Amino acid sequence: MTTEEKIINQTVHLIDTNGYQNLSLRKLTKELGLTTGAFYRHFKDKNELFQKVVIQLSKRFIEQIPLNEDYSSKQQLLIIAKYICQSITMHPNQMDFLFYQLSALDLYSNANQYPFLQKVKVLITNLNSSTTLSDQDLFIQIWSFIQGYALLIKNKITRYDAQLVEYTLDQLLKGKD
């Protein structure tokens, strides 16, 4: 494992444990037995580290979701929604980082660098056969629901309900005409 990979993996661990808001480069490098100079040989700054961590977490996240390419786009999207809702309760700090941290938000504009988001966009595009609603508008509606619902679950306002998620997805897809 390279030094850069060690830094990224330790960053993921610290984010999962303490949240990204509390990440200190000094603490990170100390735990790895590195100097801050060694850190800066691999990353320009904390923002660049966060961008690489977002990409790495995104890859891991999509690889961990039990998707079967034989399933329909709708079935795959429902599996992703369930996985997000489960993950936000098990790893709330990682999920906050992956979805709401500024480096992650910057990468949203380039889905090619964000494998998880790219997969979601492809599935939504496959579901959108309407000429009146753009793929982007449908994506925003579905993605907003999934993220909002996951936050309600994280904050213990509700519990995951697969029927509600499927019904809402069906309604969003019907409303596209």
Where would I find each of the regions flagged by the language model?
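An amphipathic alpha-helix adjacent to DNA-recognition modules
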Residues: E4-V12, Q21-N22, G33, R41-P66, ...
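Amphipathic C-terminal alpha-helical segment
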Residues: M90, W143-D161, L173-D177
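Amphipathic alpha-helical packing segments from all-alpha helical-bundle domains
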Residues: L105-T132, Q136-I140, Y167-L173
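Hydrophobic alpha-helical connector segments
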Residues: K52, P66-M90, F139-I142
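Amphipathic alpha-helical segments used for helix-helix packing
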Residues: C85-L107, L151-R159
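N-terminal intrinsically disordered/low-complexity leader segments
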Residues: M1-T2, D177
